[in-house]
Amino acid sequence: MTKTLPKDFIFGGATAAYQAEGATHTDGKGPVAWDKYLEDNYWYTAEPASDFYNRYPVDLKLSEEFGVNGIRISIAWSRIFPTGKGEVNPKGVEYYHNLFAECHKRHVEPFVTLHHFDTPEALHSDGDFLNRENIEHFVNYAEFCFKEFSEVNYWTTFNEIGPIGDGQYLVGKFPPGIQYDLAKVFQSHHNMMVSHARAVKLFKDSGYSGEIGVVHALPTKYPFDANNPDDVRAAELEDIIHNKFILDATYLGKYSDKTMEGVNHILEVNGGELDLREEDFAALDAAKDLNDFLGINYYMSDWMQAFDGETEIIHNGKGEKGSSKYQIKGVGRRKAPVDVPKTDWDWIIFPQGLYDQIMRVKADYPNYKKIYITENGLGYKDEFVDNTVYDDGRIDYVKKHLEVISDAISDGANVKGYFMWSLMDVFSWSNGYEKRYGLFYVDFETQERYPKKSAYWYKKVAETQVIE
């Protein structure tokens, strides 16, 4: 049976400042930790990325032509405050005003994120969000943006608090490249959630118009053997690290006893302790019912198996299928069922996981109000033929995920939109330019855009709300 989506559903495309803009030192932009980190550790940099800094009129015109009526954009904090605080950079402010004006001219609603992995270098090298002073700096930056950019109707504080802590302190593929420090992971999650809560409270107390929420990456975690209590426990602990800890902070304003039991177990095994203060919980509690929406980024699920051994994580950054490894001491290891498909980067394709995650939020956090799927898509080594890409695999992936969103809506979940990652090809943080996600193919040499087969398919779905 053909499935449909509501008439007012947003069919969006997603971008991020650092992955799309290029112009990393242009017009007064301050440095971010990624600038040097990519030069030192990877085979690519963020120049020119998709040159969105100059080419956004082209991308927004294409959006309008292809039925994309929402766009996720992030503001580069260091374009506004080059050192994260103090002096404002007027050229950065002007750029975003021009960008948002173009969005509205093209009838593409901007959903604007304040922080998408790109803390200014001056603050990042001072501990990033492990340093509590940076909570204040973030709230001040947020307040400036709320006041300045009154044309924005949808704000999100952070993109993917979970993967930031994960990338910086567990996997070690984000600057500062620390591995296996679970205490830092949880502390980063916590301090960023306090920053989020304080920004949301300020937004509401100040009476700004528009809506505000947060974007969480929520990969669903399953036990490898649902009948084995040890595998069930491994999945629960992995879920706490990546999902439950930050969801509790968002919607309960505290960490449930079950969540803290898991956190304490993980830290007991791996070492370290957390600094959780009364004023933190006051801030979390004050904001827990003020979020207008939750953004869910969903790409994959994981299966967890009980495991007794040391932590070892190997990141597959080059698309060499089967080269990744993930096992955490006292938690478990990832082991997927053989019949579940994977991408070349070992990302597990499992649309049912998105349905399960949406329904979990609905059941466990009934004050969620509404959900946008703020990222979902398929990374490929696209083959450019006849000025396009025949990306049937991507179409199939997105179709199946839209279908489970339709199912979730039918089953009572309030899901209001979908943003495909990514609008146009951008560079991938730890995979470079080879891993493409866009509706529009970007020739990174010439910066020309070419609609892929998926763009024509997406346009039809957006126009008809029929998933076929």
UniProtKB/Swiss-Prot annotation:
It comes from the Bacteria. Belongs to the glycosyl hydrolase 1 family. InterPro entries: 6P-beta-galactosidase, Glyco_hydro_1, Glyco_hydro_1_AS, Glyco_hydro_1_N_CS, Glycoside_hydrolase_SF. SUPFAM superfamilies: (Trans)glycosidases (SSF51445). Its EC number is 3.2.1.85. It is an enzyme of class 3 (hydrolase). One of its GO terms (biological process) is lactose catabolic process via tagatose-6-phosphate. It catalyses: a 6-phospho-beta-D-galactoside + H2O = D-galactose 6-phosphate + an alcohol. GO terms for molecular function: 6-phospho-beta-galactosidase activity; beta-glucosidase activity. The keyword Plastid does not apply. The gene is lacG. D-galactose 6-phosphate binds at residues 19, 116, 159-160, 297, 428-429, 435, 437. This is 6-phospho-beta-galactosidase. The lineage of its organism: Bacteria, Bacillati, Bacillota, Bacilli, Lactobacillales. The keyword Hydrolase applies. The active site is at 160 (proton donor), 375 (nucleophile). It comes from Streptococcus pyogenes serotype M28 (strain MGAS6180). Gene3D superfamilies: Glycosidases. NCBIfam families: lacG, PRK13511.1. GO terms for cellular component: cytosol.
